[in-house]
């Protein structure tokens, strides 16, 4: 039996050694260019170009065909997506599941809405691999990963909200003021949507706030994954704080 793990690229995980795994591209777009989020993307160049871009930007989720291509010929597929409250990726994957199972009777696709992004998705992908390696059956894997998800939490910090302004999520004037005064936004996503919880000045206060919010959310030891965008120093400081 062939079993496969699939996710969209918001997991920031393009390969997974020891697992049959495929990442499906999300797309970041402006009026002049598209960036396909895969292992070939020059992230530094994209960040630089977006930092000086004045127009609107946005994202596009994988289409049904992209998901079907990723499912390939697997007998069982275990899939997770960015929060369905933030993107159409989850609904697209569900549509692909229905089509795949209808076209291939007997095959199964489990689609899990992470209700988060990035590190949370990585934790779920790792859990899928662990249970597949333990030769658990399909229903057990689905049930145990769903339960595992309930014990995860994502906390984020934004140094800049420029891109949120460019895609219309916040006012440009608000973004300019936040950047001018070095205000960092710290938040979580308890219901799958971005939920700002704190506004602080400077990186040091942001890191302290992240850890405080971890404890408030019930963290008392355990695995933590830290993603960052060209901020290794802050990631290491947070690691040492934890």
Please give the residue ranges for each predicted region.
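Class I S-adenosyl-L-methionine
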Residues: 33-102
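A glycine-rich beta-strand to alpha-helix segment
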Residues: 81, 110-111
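Conserved beta-strand elements of the Class I
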Residues: 4-6, 78
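A short helix->loop->beta-strand "cap" motif at the edges of active sites that frequently abuts
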Residues: 105-108
């Amino acid at each position: 039996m062939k079993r496969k793990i699939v996710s969209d690229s918001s997991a920031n995980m393009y390969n997974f050694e020891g697992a049959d795994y495929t990442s499906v591209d999300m797309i970041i777009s402006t009026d002049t260019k598209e960036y396909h989020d895969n292992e070939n993307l020059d992230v530094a160049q994209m960040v630089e170009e977006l930092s000086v871009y004045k127009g609107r930007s946005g994202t596009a989720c994988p289409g049904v065909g992209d998901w079907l291509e990723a499912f390939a010929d697997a007998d069982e597929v275990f899939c997770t997506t960015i929060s369905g409250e933030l993107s159409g990726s989850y609904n697209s994957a569900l549509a692909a599941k229905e089509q795949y199972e209808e076209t291939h009777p007997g095959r199964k696709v489990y689609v899990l809405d992470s209700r988060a992004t990035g590190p949370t998705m990585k934790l779920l992908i790792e859990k899928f691999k662990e249970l597949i390696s333990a030769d658990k059956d399909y229903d057990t894997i689905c049930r145990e990963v769903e339960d595992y998800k309930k014990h995860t939490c994502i906390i984020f910090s934004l140094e800049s909200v420029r891109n949120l302004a460019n895609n219309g999520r916040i006012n440009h004037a608000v973004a300019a003021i936040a950047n001018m005064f070095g205000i960092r936004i710290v938040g979580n996503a308890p219901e799958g949507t971005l939920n700002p919880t704190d506004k602080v000045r400077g990186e040091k206060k942001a890191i302290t706030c992240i850890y405080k919010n971890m404890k408030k959310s019930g963290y008392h030891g355990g695995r933590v994954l830290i993603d960052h965008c060209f901020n290794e120093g802050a990631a290491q400081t947070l690691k040492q704080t934890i």
